Amino acid sequence: MISQDKNYSDDQISQDSEIDTIEAVSETEAVSETNEIIDMRDDRIQKLEVELVQAQQRERDLLLRSKAEIENMRRRNEIEVEKVYKFSLERFVSELLPVIDNLERALEMSDKSSQNLASTIEGIELTLKSLLNVVQKFGIKVVSETHVPFNPDIHQAMTILESEEHEPNHVIIVMQKGYLLNGRLIRPAMVTVSKTKS
């Protein structure tokens, strides 16, 4: 019976040993699977953290771009409003220029030696001076200088005269004054330009 008990015990030990081995393998596999799951979750967490950082960066970039675009639009609108303000008088000034020209012509053609016309001439001079002061307050600049280089941006050459007294390509006579409104040409000055004698 002892031998049977021994065999039984050996079988029991063997089975227990197999069970322990199976349990150990199962535990190892379970730990391994758990570690794999944890590793997969860690990888997923890291991936999600990277995606989160990228999404936050995209949001910051989008916010900065939006702010910059709003600032650019605000600046463009300010510039546009300023242009509208500066040049809103352009049409009015264009209509006013012939009046100024007529007053200047009236002064040129008047007989300044006549005592009868002295007060009329003085009235025209004061009216012209007052009118020019008003238009200058609104950014109107007269282009009427002579002995300056010809500038096609503000001058319109009507004639060319040979002259030894003047430098070539210079304005020697202004036939009709030109006008600028805040730097923008309203009407070019009609001028005579010098050239060297051939």
UniProtKB/Swiss-Prot annotation:
Cellular component terms (Gene Ontology): cytosol
Gene3D superfamilies: 3.90.20.20, Head domain of nucleotide exchange factor GrpE
Domain of life: Bacteria
Molecular function terms from GO: adenyl-nucleotide exchange factor activity; protein homodimerization activity; protein-folding chaperone binding; unfolded protein binding
Pfam families: GrpE
CDD domains: GrpE (cd00446)
Subcellular location: Cytoplasm
Protein family according to the UniProt entry: Belongs to the GrpE family.
Assembly mode: Homodimer.
Cited PANTHER family: GRPE PROTEIN, GRPE PROTEIN HOMOLOG, MITOCHONDRIAL
Function: Participates actively in the response to hyperosmotic and heat shock by preventing the aggregation of stress-denatured proteins, in association with DnaK and GrpE. It is the nucleotide exchange factor for DnaK and may function as a thermosensor. Unfolded proteins bind initially to DnaJ; upon interaction with the DnaJ-bound protein, DnaK hydrolyzes its bound ATP, resulting in the formation of a stable complex. GrpE releases ADP from DnaK; ATP binding to DnaK triggers the release of the substrate protein, thus completing the reaction cycle.
Descriptive protein name: Protein GrpE
Gene name tied to this protein: grpE
